[in-house]
Amino acid sequence: HANYDLNILANYGIVVQGLKHDSMLESYVWNATATRHDMDSLANKYLGYETIKYEQVAGKGARQISFSQVDLDTACRYAAEDADITLRLHLALWPKLDSVPALRKVYEEIEIPLVPVLAAMEQRGVLIDGDVLRRQSQQLGKRMLELQQQAHAVAGHEFNLDSPKQLQAVLFDELGLQAKLKTPTGQPSTNEEALEAIADTHELPRLILDYRSLAKLRSTYTDKLSSIVNPRTGRVHTSYHQGSVA
């Protein structure tokens, strides 16, 4: 995963030039329909080898420690295996690509040149205006409250717009709307598709859909982005997964 390594080294002022190969991208170009191109999966698939998992050296969940806290002997064995397996995967995968000129061309002229470009984009990050986001979040919250009040007025009483159970009761029991879709357990569905299907039969489903769209904007963007700004750079740093099918 050259992109990851380039970013780690860049954090220490080391700029890598002349990148030639990436075993993850070799696997991706060779078999783009495969679901996994990570080192552990590729080692098992092409080398028949079970790698040391990160959780085995650092733990998992709440008890997981940072790699800097792993004892030196264990860290060295893990890192050495990582380097060794990466080379062995390249030796296994490169002959395959090299034997198919069209695939080699894609790899050498598109995928590999793209690696440092994406790495640079990740390092640069995206400048975020926190003040604008906060204002937008407040505006969204105000509009959501208005939609909530409208929904309560239409239903004739207050209810939780975020509760599928309460929505089922209001829409299908109290208002008597005909459910077009069911959940796996046979209950009337209140997901987006189900509400769209009945939105022309009553105004409440459309109010709920509008409320949900604003709630998603607020939770995913205006509230979330401010919380993931890197305090050192003042930017949001994205991650681009090159070895995947769009």
Where do the protein language model's features map onto the residues?
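Conserved "right-hand" nucleotidyltransferase catalytic core of DNA-directed polymerases
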Residues: 4, 10-11, 21, 34, ...
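Conserved beta-strand -> loop -> alpha-helix junction used to position metal-binding or nucleic-acid-contacting
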Residues: 15-31, 39-41
